[in-house]
């Protein structure tokens, strides 16, 4: 079971890690972030767009409304700076959500339809865990693309967040 304390830490971790990867990608030379690469979403920005789309999908599930998406990513992506602003708003929404949910609410099951078809059911806590894990997975894709561009991104591991940010804020 995901507790309120864990949900709050995880949503803050996700926002912190997103800031690291977005600032690293933003510092690249012009055109490098959208240069075609042999990877699932073809470039860094489109890869970063995918977790944002999924965050929006699950936001709609949590709010009990239709999300309007027919695919797990959009055909094109916005410019990096526009995407980053949208991701920050979304990260804040999830941090605020985790701050107001109770343990009982985190354990409540949300029913939804998967974009690819089929019934889904996850607790609010499982949704938060999934979104944090999902974003980490795709930041890893971007970190690999950064390494291909001879850029070594700053560590955005949970252990680093716990050591440098979370425990410092708590203590």
Task: Name each model feature, range by range.
Residues 3:
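N-terminal beta-strand motif that seeds the catalytic metal site of vicinal oxygen chelate
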Residues 65-106:
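Helix-adjacent hinge/juxtasegments
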Residues 7, 18, 80, 87-91, ...:
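A structural signal for well-ordered alpha-helical scaffolds and beta->alpha junctions
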Residues 103-115:
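Carboxylate-rich helix-loop segments that flank metal/cofactor sites and access channels
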């Amino acid at each position: 079971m995901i507790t309120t304390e864990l949900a709050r830490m995880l949503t803050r971790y996700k926002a912190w890690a997103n800031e690291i990867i977005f600032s690293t990608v933003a510092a690249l030379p012009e055109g490098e972030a959208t240069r075609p690469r042999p990877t699932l979403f073809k470039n860094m920005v489109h890869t970063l767009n995918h977790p944002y789309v999924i965050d929006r999908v699950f936001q709609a599930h949590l709010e009990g409304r239709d999300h309007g998406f027919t695919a797990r990513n959009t055909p094109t992506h916005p410019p990096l700076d526009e995407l980053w602003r949208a991701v920050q708003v979304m990260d804040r929404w999830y941090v605020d959500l985790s701050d107001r949910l109770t343990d009982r609410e985190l354990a409540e099951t949300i029913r939804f339809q998967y974009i690819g078809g089929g019934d889904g059911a996850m607790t609010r806590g499982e949704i938060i865990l999934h979104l944090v894990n999902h974003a980490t997975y795709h930041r890893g894709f971007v970190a690999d693309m950064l390494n291909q561009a001879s850029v070594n991104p700053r560590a955005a591991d949970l252990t680093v967040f716990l050591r440098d940010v979370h425990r410092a804020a708590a203590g």
